[in-house]
Amino acid sequence: MKVDVGPDPSLVYRPDVDPEMAKSKDSFRNYTSGPLLDRVFTTYKLMHTHQTVDFVSRKRIQYGSFSYKKMTIMEAVGMLDDLVDESDPDVDFPNSFHAFQTAEGIRKAHPDKDWFHLVGLLHDLGKIMALWGEPQWAVVGDTFPVGCRPQASVVFCDSTFQDNPDLQDPRYSTELGMYQPHCGLENVLMSWGHDEYLYQMMKFNKFSLPSEAFYMIRFHSFYPWHTGGDYRQLCSQQDLDMLPWVQEFNKFDLYTKCPDLPDVESLRPYYQGLIDKYCPGTLSW
């Protein structure tokens, strides 16, 4: 049975991208009004109401034992085909193709960094949470830190947080909230979604990827940070050093989706070799 994960707002609505720049890219940005935008707003309204310190803490416990399924990376890639992504309503091809498209875009630009190619294949695997009953607002969309006041570049910031109980709690409603200045993003509780799930899963299964890969996975949907320039008060020097890597990955995530489909079967042996190198065998999900 296919599960409708809906449009990923991170790919549909980007108010902080220069429209002229967007016009030179693929037509993924041709969603700016009408019912789709209404659905995106509703998704963010639900997300910004329910993503709290308590909610995120409970989700980390719920998924933290990684006892939902045992499977390989390639089996998880295949599961993406059970997700219906309405952000591409006119392009009827399996979601797994986007994983290979992203990976191949990175491979062409960075042929000497095989670990980076693998990140392209892996980056959306956390969306399988939708197959386990998670609502869209807890799977996709832009992420942000909980436990402190949302900053200006968070999408729909001024119109979607009114019902979030954390903002009525003095511990969580200031710019720093429950954090210390420059505490480092590794010490920050991020909103729950496919980024955070996969990051935690990779740590649990001891992927032998470099730290740049973990940053790309955990923060590729953290647009208020890597594109909006916010939340610098929480960053350590390491975070700032890693920021260009996340920004580099983001280019391929957004702009490699197109109807020219890769020959997945011919690519599979190469990527299986990378999996065997960095995250082999049956893993805990």
Swiss-Prot record:
Binding site for Fe cation 2: D124, H194, H220
GO MF term list: aldo-keto reductase (NADPH) activity; ferric iron binding; inositol oxygenase activity; oxidoreductase activity; oxidoreductase activity, acting on NAD(P)H
Binding site for substrate: R29, D85, E86, S87, D88, K127, G141, D142, H220, S221
Entry keyword annotation includes Oxidoreductase: yes
Keywords in alphabetical order: Cytoplasm, Iron, Metal-binding, Oxidoreductase, Phosphoprotein
Binding annotation for Fe cation 1: H98, H123, D124, D253
Enzyme superclass (EC): oxidoreductase
Enzyme Commission number, as recorded: 1.13.99.1
Example of a GO biological process term: inositol catabolic process
Summary of the tissues where the protein is detected: Kidney specific. Renal proximal tubules.
Free-text cofactor note: Binds 2 iron ions per subunit.
Subcellular location: Cytoplasm
Phosphoserine PTM positions: S33
Cofactor(s) needed: Fe cation
Annotated InterPro entries: Aldo/ket_reductase_CS, Inositol_oxygenase
CC per GO annotation: cytoplasm; inclusion body
Family stated for the protein in its record: Belongs to the myo-inositol oxygenase family.
Stated name of the protein: Inositol oxygenase
Organism lineage: Eukaryota, Metazoa, Chordata, Craniata, Vertebrata
